[in-house]
C-alpha cells in the first residue's frame, strides 16, 4: 500500500488528511504516476457545436480537421472524440487532447495553420459554433483514480506508469487528499468568471477569463470489453443513476457551484458511438464539488452502487481525474456558441 502522493511531491503537511494514518481502504484502486521531470500537463477540449442532422456532416468535417491538426509538429500525445446533446438542444462534438509539455502545446496552438484556422472569418460565417476550453494544471494540481491498471485513458495516457494500490480512497474527502497541493493549500477560488472580450448574448467571438483553482473533473466508464453480466450491471444499474446525477448537474448545477456539466459518449471519426463515456464537469472549486458528492441524493446513489460492485469488477473500467489550475493556465474561447455553453452561462459581463 502506498500514498497517492508520489514521493517527490510530498512535503510537510500543514493540512491534515480526513482519515488516520492506519486507515485501510475497502478495495483496491490505483493512480497514474509520472517521474519528477513532469512539471505540468495540458488538458485541451476543442468543441464543434451544431444543431440537427442538416449540420452534422459539416460539424464532423470540422472535428476531423481538428484531429488532423494534431499530427502537426508539437501535437498532443493522446486524444479522444465525444458527442453529446446539451439542454439547449444543440449537438456538440469535442476533441480532447493531452500534452505532457505545455511549451509544446503553446507552440502547436500558435502555429500558423492552427492559429489561422481559429482566427479565420470562416469560423464566424460557416454556421457552426466552436469552443476551446483548456486547463494546464501543474503536477501538484491534479489527481487520478482508476479501478484498473492498464491502458489508462485521459491524462493517464501521458503519464509514465501506474502506482501500486493506494491508501487515499473509499472515504469522503479522499479526492482532496490525493492532490499533492492539498498538503498545504485549501485550493480556494481566487475570483469569478469574467467575460473579457465579446458578448455571449450576441454570439461571435467571446473570451472568458477563468480564476485560480477552477476545478475540472473527468469521470469515465468503459464497458467495451465487458461481458454480459458486467454490461448489464453498468447499463441497467449504474447508468440510470449516473444519468440522473449528470442531468441534475447540467440543469441545476449553477447554485451549487457547477459551471458546466456534460455527459458525453465517445465516438469514432465518423461519429459512430463507442461503448465508452465520461462526464466533463467544471466547478468553481474542489470544495463545491465535494459538497455535492457528499450530500446530494443522486451522487450518494452512484457512490453506494460503486461501493457494492467495485471489488468484483473485471472488464468494466471506471476512473476519474480531477484538477485545479491557475487562471494564467486556462483558456476559454468561444465562437458563435449559444450563451449557455461552457463558461459562458456563469461568466460576468462587465458593464458597457
Swiss-Prot record:
Keywords: Heme, Iron, Lyase, Metal-binding. Active when the heme iron is in the ferrous state. Heme b binds at residue 299. Its EC number is 4.8.1.2. The keyword Nucleotide-binding does not apply. Belongs to the heme-containing dehydratase family. Homodimer. This is Aliphatic aldoxime dehydratase. It comes from Pseudomonas sp. The lineage of its organism: Bacteria, Pseudomonadati, Pseudomonadota, Gammaproteobacteria, Pseudomonadales.
Amino acid at each position: 500500500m502506498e500514498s497517492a502522493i508520489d514521493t517527490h511531491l510530498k512535503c510537510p503537511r500543514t493540512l491534515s488528511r480526513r482519515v488516520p494514518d492506519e486507515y485501510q481502504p475497502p478495495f483496491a484502486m490505483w493512480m497514474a504516476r509520472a517521474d519528477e521531470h513532469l512539471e505540468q500537463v495540458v488538458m485541451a477540449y476543442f468543441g464543434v457545436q451544431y444543431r440537427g442532422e442538416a449540420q452534422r456532416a459539416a460539424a464532423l468535417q470540422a472535428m476531423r480537421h481538428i484531429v488532423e491538426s494534431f499530427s502537426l509538429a508539437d501535437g498532443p500525445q493522446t486524444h479522444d472524440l465525444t458527442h453529446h446533446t446539451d439542454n439547449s438542444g444543440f449537438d456538440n462534438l469535442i476533441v480532447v487532447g493531452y500534452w505532457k509539455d505545455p511549451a509544446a502545446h503553446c507552440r502547436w496552438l500558435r502555429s500558423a495553420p492552427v492559429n489561422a484556422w481559429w482566427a479565420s472569418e470562416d469560423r464566424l460565417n460557416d454556421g457552426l459554433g466552436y469552443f476551446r476550453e483548456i486547463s494546464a494544471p501543474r503536477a501538484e494540481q491534479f489527481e487520478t483514480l482508476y479501478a484498473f491498471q492498464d491502458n489508462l485513458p485521459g491524462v493517464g495516457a501521458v503519464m509514465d506508469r501506474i502506482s501500486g494500490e493506494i491508501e487515499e480512497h473509499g472515504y469522503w474527502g479522499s479526492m482532496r487528499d490525493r492532490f499533492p497541493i492539498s498538503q498545504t493549500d485549501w485550493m480556494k477560488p481566487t475570483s469569478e468568471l469574467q467575460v473579457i472580450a465579446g458578448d455571449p448574448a450576441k454570439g461571435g467571438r467571446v473570451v472568458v477569463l477563468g480564476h485560480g483553482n477552477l476545478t475540472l473533473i473527468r469521470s469515465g466508464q468503459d464497458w467495451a470489453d465487458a461481458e454480459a453480466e458486467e454490461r448489464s450491471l453498468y447499463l441497467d444499474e449504474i447508468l440510470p443513476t449516473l444519468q440522473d446525477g449528470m442531468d441534475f448537474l447540467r440543469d441545476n448545477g449553477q447554485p451549487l457551484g457547477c459551471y458546466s456539466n456534460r455527459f458525453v459518449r465517445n465516438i469514432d471519426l465518423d461519429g459512430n458511438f463507442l461503448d465508452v463515456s465520461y462526464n466533463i464537469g467544471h466547478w468553481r472549486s474542489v470544495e463545491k464539488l465535494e459538497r455535492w458528492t457528499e450530500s446530494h441524493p443522486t451522487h450518494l446513489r452512484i457512490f453506494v452502487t460503486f461501493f457494492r460492485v467495485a471489488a468484483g469488477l473485471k472488464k468494466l473500467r471506471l476512473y476519474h481525474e480531477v484538477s485545479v489550475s491557475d487562471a494564467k493556465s486556462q483558456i476559454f474561447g468561444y465562437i458563435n456558441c449559444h450563451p449557455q455553453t461552457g463558461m459562458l452561462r456563469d461568466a460576468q459581463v462587465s458593464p458597457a
